[in-house]
Amino acid sequence: MLIAIDHGNKQVKTVHGNAIVSGVQKSKTRPYGRDVLKYGGSYYTLSAQRIPYQKDKTTDERFFILSLFAIAEEIEAQGAYTSGLMPIDLAIGLPPAHFGAQNKAFVRYFKRKEPIYFSYRDKLYSILIRNVQCYPQAFAAAAMMLGELATVPRALILDVGGFTADYLLLLSLIHI
């Protein structure tokens, strides 16, 4: 199953799942509520208090945990849940300004050799993240119109997020 995740500074989003605030709380005991994720002996709940801006999102586990929430939401939204091991391919993005320096580390952060076991809303998930592909964030939006963009000498793609704005300048695309 291919799952695309936008790890925004304000929200984490997938194609079909609900957007979630980029904030998470960790607890050793099960907190009250329905939207509880258990992973590695700890419990996690989403928080309205977003994670402060991080240039490098791989410095701790929080964006990985947010990704588990997003993966579970996307699996459910697509009606693709199975109790067996679910192979997952991730498509992730980085701001164009950070892509060259961080894309390899971002891929390593998500890719796992072993299955990942977690529960969300008291349902057990067994996933194996097989492949991880990282793309410049603004380019994902442009990919939908590459044919049209190839007819102009240059195009400026803007990605306006909750707290940031990124751009990507495309020059002289060749339509094949």
What are these regions (language model features)?
Residues 1-157, 172-174:
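Nucleotide/phosphate-binding catalytic cleft detector across ATP-hydrolyzing
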Residues 160-166, 176:
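Ser/Thr-glycine-rich phosphate-binding loops at phosphate-binding pockets of nucleotides
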